[in-house]
């Protein structure tokens, strides 16, 4: 193993020690919670709960990434980073490796959920693969935006801004959909929805959407890493 990778893994292990400082049992609990809840809801014909469960799941996996930042800012825990024989750039790389680990845990949870829905014969099992891919993309874009902010500002400010932005977007979406439903004739809405469904069923679009999704997620992570390095290198520990 080359020195660079050894240095990054040392920083990654330190971050993982922070995340698991209260115990490691929450890891399998977090991974299994979504499959159990969604599969149980599907078996009871309560598929409407799925959206709320996955919204909570994204929040949990965002907290995994936020926890090392909280640990560092409480009791001046960040001073240890100045003593660790790892360069700051490698410390950031270790933090992004933790980001990818949390994304991997979310992916495992999605795959288990898909399997559970298929076993109980849930109506949404056929298209859940696309939902899981979209969920992964949203998570990667979200943490790509949050990570540089957590290097630049306090975790309290980032958490507050995050909640404000999410609530604003939710109210905007609900208000927009309500306005569209009230102002646009029903026949026009039916034609538009039929067009969207036909577009979603077009198998030719799947490779194109996959390439766009992978490219945008990779670009977001690359830009996020560069910005995080710049903020952290300029930060006084």
Protein language model regions, located:
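Terminal targeting/leader modules
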Residues: 77-81
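Short helix-to-coil transition segments within interhelical loops
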Residues: 82-88
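Hydrophobic alpha-helical transmembrane segments of membrane proteins
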Residues: 1-76, 94-237
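Alpha-helix N-cap/helix-start motif at helix boundaries, enriched for small hydrophobics
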Residues: 90-92
């Amino acid at each position: 193993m080359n020195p660079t990778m050894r240095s990054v893994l040392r920083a990654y292990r330190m971050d993982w020690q922070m995340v698991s400082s209260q115990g490691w049992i929450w890891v399998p609990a977090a991974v299994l919670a979504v499959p159990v809840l969604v599969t149980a809801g599907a078996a009871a014909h309560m598929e409407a709960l799925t959206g709320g469960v996955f919204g909570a799941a994204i929040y949990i996996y965002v907290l995994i990434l936020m926890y090392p930042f909280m640990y560092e800012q409480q009791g001046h825990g960040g001073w240890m980073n100045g003593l660790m024989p790892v360069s700051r750039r490698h410390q950031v790389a270790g933090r992004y490796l933790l980001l990818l680990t949390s994304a991997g845990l979310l992916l495992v949870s999605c795959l288990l959920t898909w399997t559970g829905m298929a076993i109980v014969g849930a109506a949404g099992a056929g298209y859940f693969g696309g939902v899981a891919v979209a969920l992964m993309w949203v998570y990667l874009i979200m943490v790509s935006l949050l990570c540089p902010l957590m290097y630049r500002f306090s975790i309290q400010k980032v958490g507050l801004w995050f909640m404000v932005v999410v609530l604003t977007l939710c109210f905007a979406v609900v208000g927009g959909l309500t306005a569209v439903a009230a102002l646009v004739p029903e026949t026009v809405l039916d034609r538009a929805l039929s067009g969207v469904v036909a577009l979603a069923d077009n198998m030719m679009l799947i490779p194109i959407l996959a390439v766009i999704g992978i490219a945008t997620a990779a670009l977001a992570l690359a830009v996020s890493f560069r910005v995080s390095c710049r903020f952290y290198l300029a930060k006084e520990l």
